[in-house]
Amino acid sequence: MADTDDTATLRYPGGEIDLQIVHATEGADGIALGPLLAKTGHTTFDVGFANTAAAKSSITYIDGDAGILRYRGYPIDQLAEKSTFIEVCYLLIYGELPDTDQLAQFTGRIQRHTMLHEDLKRFFDGFPRNAHPMPVLSSVVNALSAYYQDALDPMDNGQVELSTIRLLAKLPTIAAYAYKKSVGQPFLYPDNSLTLVENFLRLTFGFPAEPYQADPEVVRALDMLFILHADHEQNCSTSTVRLVGSSRANLFTSISGGINALWGPLHGGANQAVLEMLEGIRDSGDDVSEFVRKVKNREAGVKLMGFGHRVYKNYDPRARIVKEQADKILAKLGGDDSLLGIAKELEEAALTDDYFIERKLYPNVDFYTGLIYRALGFPTRMFTVLFALGRLPGWIAHWREMHDEGDSKIGRPRQIYTGYTERDYVTIDAR
């Protein structure tokens, strides 16, 4: 990205100001607003930050109109087809695809840090068995700050690297233990001869008294889903990680904040909502055309889940990949074909209906992922946990990029105050 002498002129009551244009290598250029308040007395008002770039980033590029998603320049379809999740982790965090030796060293370092401190394992005892796994995940990740105090300084590159490896290694273990806690099953120790995804599946579904062998197709399907979720530039949870980290909070605490943001139903919980919608269509006995009619009737209060996106105004490129994978996995594992059939029929109906076409409502990545997760054996409450596992390398990459900039500032948004002007205090007996 090159900063030049190009400017944009902003006119306001009482004057005008020239603001520097910040050029992107692809996509929208930005207008630097740094001097705006000091020179004009005005600030910008952008609810939801839909038009605000809070950072320069070289990690992920999205063209929502064209349906393009690239990690470090590589198209998502190529990575999903040819790469692995561990390789994509390396790519996002370090900027380039690893060679054979680099990948082996990276994998080996992660494998040596998969276990949790024995005292930390007792942390899970403090949660009720019916606790949702997301607050468990967030709390235990934050608690890593107390158990691994030798790697908390965000300005020490060696400590940042160690905390990076620890998070990549331990989050799958924490996620699996959160699941085991919810079903009353014993924890397993990690098996460092396995890949990251194989280890996670064994920790989640295995038992101490019997061997566990993950189906290679299941491993590949979950690995691919993690790749698709690995980053999506400045979304709510990633922006949260950056904002928390801007105060120089350590990486563990910053990632915990991102997990909390992801738990919100408007962010990470959409795939569960899609599954519930499909089940509702099936159980109601209505056909898809009747459901579509209700969606189009605002007074009916029926929502179409898994369609539309804050960024994409075209078909989400991840959704095409997930749809193909859903066919394969459900055919192999004998998942609920009725729900897949409803999903396909609903997609076809929406893509050919002017109501949805005019509103640019296309399937997003959440539309089919819930079907795959359930076919793999995960309960719906684990869906957002799986999202977090996939998104972790993106969060880490953005946190590190922010600190590597050198001139980063603590995040501190402005506001437009709409409250009372000054008034005098009145004692309680006079109110």
Curated annotation (Swiss-Prot):
The protein's assembly and partners: Homohexamer.
EC number per UniProt: 2.3.3.16
Pathway(s) where this gene product acts: Carbohydrate metabolism; tricarboxylic acid cycle; isocitrate from oxaloacetate: step 1/2
Similarity comment: family membership: Belongs to the citrate synthase family.
Catalysed reactions, as listed in the record: oxaloacetate + acetyl-CoA + H2O = citrate + CoA + H(+)
Swiss-Prot/TrEMBL keywords: Allosteric enzyme, Isopeptide bond, Transferase, Tricarboxylic acid cycle, Ubl conjugation
Enzyme class: transferase
Placement of covalent cross-link Isoglutamyl lysine isopeptide (Lys-Gln) (interchain with Q-Cter in protein Pup): 328
PROSITE patterns: CITRATE_SYNTHASE
CDD domains per the UniProt record, alphabetical: EcCS_like
GO molecular function term, any single one: citrate (Si)-synthase activity
Gene3D superfamilies assigned: 2.20.28.60, Citrate Synthase, domain 1, Cytochrome P450-Terp, domain 2
Organism annotation: Mycobacterium tuberculosis (strain ATCC 25618 / H37Rv)
NCBIfam families, alphabetized: cit_synth_I (TIGR01798), PRK05614.1 (NF004126)
Miscellaneous comment text of the record: Citrate synthase is found in nearly all cells capable of oxidative metabolism.
Residues forming the catalytic site: 309, 366
Protein known as: Citrate synthase 1
Cell division as UniProt keyword: no
Gene: gltA2
Listed PANTHER family: CITRATE SYNTHASE
UniProt-listed Pfam families: Citrate_synt
Alphabetical GO biological process terms: tricarboxylic acid cycle
